């Protein structure tokens, strides 16, 4: 069996009726990209369920890389995340839970760095004409939650050879049509950008 990459996206959330990461993951699921076979998973925007579901799929699939996607409505560039922090805080999730400054894991490390080759991903995207830059904050919402949970799990299991990290994407044009002030990119371009990043791993 070749290398498997676990590619995750999210369902729509808050007042965003479309989440482009959901469409991208569905489009790329089952594809062969570079040396990887893509296994796609759509996660709920839920502090309570998203991390457990992610780890369940990781244990089932046993991938050699984990590439997590999320929507950063308002950002105009593709932004690979450098770090995840041990905090849950934000507006109500799908379950009506709105934590305030709660640790993701009591006693866990304050932060974990992405183990993806973040700068190389950005360079590849820029070379291909995509606006991209590093982000030093994945926020404190569910995107940060799943990034932290994944990296914490790999650290605790001594499986840090598995490349894992998170990339935030701008809104798609379909979503921006509903929220006119949002910077956006075409969904096909976002899908192409994700494909390029996976090729670069």
UniProtKB/Swiss-Prot annotation:
Annotated compartments: Cytoplasm
Example of a GO cellular component annotation carried by this entry: cytosol
Enzyme class, first EC level, given as a word: hydrolase
Domain of life where this protein originates: Bacteria
Coiled-coil positions: none
Active site, per annotation: 81, 143, 168
Pfam families: Peptidase_C15
Keywords assigned by UniProt, alphabetized: Cytoplasm, Hydrolase, Protease, Thiol protease
Keyword Membrane found: no
Catalytic activity: Release of an N-terminal pyroglutamyl group from a polypeptide, the second amino acid generally not being Pro
Similarity-based family: Belongs to the peptidase C15 family.
Name this polypeptide is given: Pyrrolidone-carboxylate peptidase
Taxonomic source organism: Halalkalibacterium halodurans (strain ATCC BAA-125 / DSM 18197 / FERM 7344 / JCM 9153 / C-125) (Bacillus halodurans)
């Amino acid at each position: 069996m070749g290398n498997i990459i676990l590619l995750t996206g999210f369902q729509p959330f808050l007042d965003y009726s479309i989440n482009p990461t959901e469409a991208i993951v569905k489009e790329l699921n089952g594809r062969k990209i570079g040396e990887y076979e893509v296994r796609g998973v759509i996660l709920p925007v839920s502090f309570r369920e998203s991390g457990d579901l992610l780890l369940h799929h990781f244990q089932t699939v046993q991938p050699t890389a984990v590439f997590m996607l999320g929507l950063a409505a308002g950002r105009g560039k593709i932004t690979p995340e450098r770090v995840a922090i041990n905090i849950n805080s934000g507006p109500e999730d799908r379950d009506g839970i709105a934590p305030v400054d709660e640790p993701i894991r009591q006693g866990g490390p304050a932060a974990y760095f992405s183990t993806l080759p973040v700068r190389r991903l950005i360079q590849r995207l820029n070379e291909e004409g995509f606006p991209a830059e590093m982000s030093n904050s994945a926020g404190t919402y569910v995107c940060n939650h799943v990034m932290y949970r994944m990296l914490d799990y790999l650290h605790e299991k001594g499986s840090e050879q598995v490349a894992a990290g998170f990339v935030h994407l701008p809104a798609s044009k379909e979503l921006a049509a509903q929220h006119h002030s949002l910077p956006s990119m075409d969904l096909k371009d976002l899908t192409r950008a994700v494909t390029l990043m996976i090729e670069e791993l």
